[in-house]
Amino acid sequence: MSVNFVKVIPVVGAVIYKNGKILAAQRKKDSRLGGLWEFPGGKIEPNESPKDALKREINEELEAEIEIHEEICTTVYEYDFATIKLTTFRCTMQTDTIKLNEHQDAKWLNTSDINSVTWAPADIPTIRAIMEAD
């Protein structure tokens, strides 16, 4: 009998609000899940708290500062390349501009327009939670 243990990668995502809109970021076409939209964020490094990881990732990806508020939800999603445990947080933008260092596009969406883009599968439970809370 063999047992396969799946490594679960802990990641965080920022649901960033500014002027009543939410930031959606489009993955680069040549990346995994290329062209899909997501909440910006990334892997939690060893000995790093989720909130510290989120601040670091937003600074790296968008050259922006955020204030982190409450957790929205946690989702475990099995992609063909990895299983991730995504925790998303409601955040507010603390800077006026963003720079797309790791994404090809970004949009500020009203919650009523949140389904106007094609989201990465792991982000769908967060979308549902946002819609239920709205």
What spans do the regions from the language model cover?
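Hydrophobic packing within well-folded, soluble alpha/beta domains
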Residues: A14, P50-I58, E71, F89, ...
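Conserved hydrophobic "DFG−1" position in protein kinase catalytic cores
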Residues: I16-Y17, A24, C91, W108
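Conserved Nudix-box catalytic region and its N-terminal flanking loop in Nudix hydrolases
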Residues: K21-E60
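Short secondary-structure junctions
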Residues: E61-I68
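Active-site-adjacent beta-strand/loop module that shapes the phosphate/pyrophosphate-binding cleft
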Residues: E65, T75-T97, K107
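NUDIX/MutT-family hydrolases
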Residues: R90, K99-I130
